[in-house]
Amino acid sequence: MNIAKLAIKVAVKIPKIEQFERYLFIGPHADDIEIGAGATVAKLASMGKKITFLICTDGRFGDGASDGVKGDALAELRKTECLKSAKLLGVEDVRFLGLKDGGGYVYDDLLKKLAETVSEVNPQIIFAPDHLSGSESHEDHLNVGKAARTIACFAPYENLMTDRFSVKGADVEAIAFYMTSRPNRFVKVKGLLNKQFDSIFKCHTSQYKEGAPESDSLKLYMKIRYYQYGCKEGFRVYSKTHMHCLPEAD
């Protein structure tokens, strides 16, 4: 038995996701939040929580099912799709950084833009893709997960945020990673899977064609995870105490 790990588990509780009031969901691309956390978003919105979506890249290279729409036109289309999807889930505050899809940006620019948004929105918990899942290899997902983790850690330190990013600090209390293979917190989302599917397959139609093998495979995968977790979505959650100098918290 790892005594240090047990002591941390007892002394520093993993926050419950529903306990907060202000949420920032960060997506590398326009459809990632819906895939990784769409049912949870719908539940939180129905509870009256304040939710902001932040989409980091323009998605211009996600053209595998876009019927020939490419480049700037696809980037604009994906914005429209994202706004439609967010509204279906109950989210009105949607923001776009407009960074070039596929890692075509400077990482420090992403970091600064995240700091600016976190300072402005002042979320209590930040959601981002798990960049440490092992198999994840997309540069945008790796960059966004890492940057979100850094800002979640730095945000409560007013002087640090001002000195490095020229913004105010924020009252971030936790980070939650979606698309993770290591969940330690679960949100009951019974009855919300179809709404999550609609937010993906009826809104992001440039990415998912009805009846296409890729769409059917994604639906099946999401159903398996949903039932595997007992009609819940799973996340890897750390409080601000877990984020620094406590390796056993992992």
What is the meaning of each model-derived region?
Residues 1-121, 245-248:
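Active-site rim/loop-helix segments in enzyme catalytic domains that contact anionic ligands
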Residues 2-24, 105-250:
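Metal-dependent de-N-acetylase/amidase catalytic core
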